[in-house]
Amino acid sequence: MMHMTFYWGKDVTILFDGWRTATWTGYLLSLVALLLASAFYQYLEAFRIRVKLLAGAKPASIPPPASSDAARAPLLLPSSAAGRWPARLATAGLFGVNSGLGYLLMLAVMSFNGGVFVAVVVGLAAGYLAFRSSDGEDLVVVDNPCACA
């Protein structure tokens, strides 16, 4: 019978029938594996965001307007999306892998075991701290390194 409320114990089925824990050693190794998978989820998300930002950092093919034409210049410059297909495919692939891993972590938490829940949450927090909480959170890729631009 599947649990419908949180419980604490070493006997848990995680994701499928082949991943059952009956000993404390197996249970603790499973919790470590879930913690590492959760941290890896955060790493993949940070990597996907960096790839997406770096792919969009290519300079525009249209030069900036002269100061006299600034009032008539378009607000958005057209981007050349033709050369960005490999980067778009890479970010889509990373998004798919990351989504799949996220859903697997959600299903593991749905075992309603308290240790599994804590391991996933601690892994997500540790991964966020390690890979996504730096000052580059609001990372903006600038094509012109001049501070006055």
Curated annotation (Swiss-Prot):
One of its GO terms (cellular component) is plasma membrane. The chain crosses the membrane at residues 21-41, 104-124. InterPro entries: Cop_transporter. Disulfide bonds: none annotated. It is a multi-pass membrane protein. It is found in: Membrane. The keyword Protein transport does not apply. It holds the Pfam family Ctr. GO terms for molecular function: copper ion transmembrane transporter activity. Keywords: Copper, Copper transport, Ion transport, Membrane, Transmembrane, Transmembrane helix, Transport. Its main location: membrane. Involved in the transport of copper. Belongs to the copper transporter (Ctr) (TC 1.A.56) family. SLC31A subfamily. This is Copper transporter 5.1. It comes from Oryza sativa subsp. japonica (Rice). The lineage of its organism: Eukaryota, Viridiplantae, Streptophyta, Embryophyta, Tracheophyta. The gene is COPT5.1.
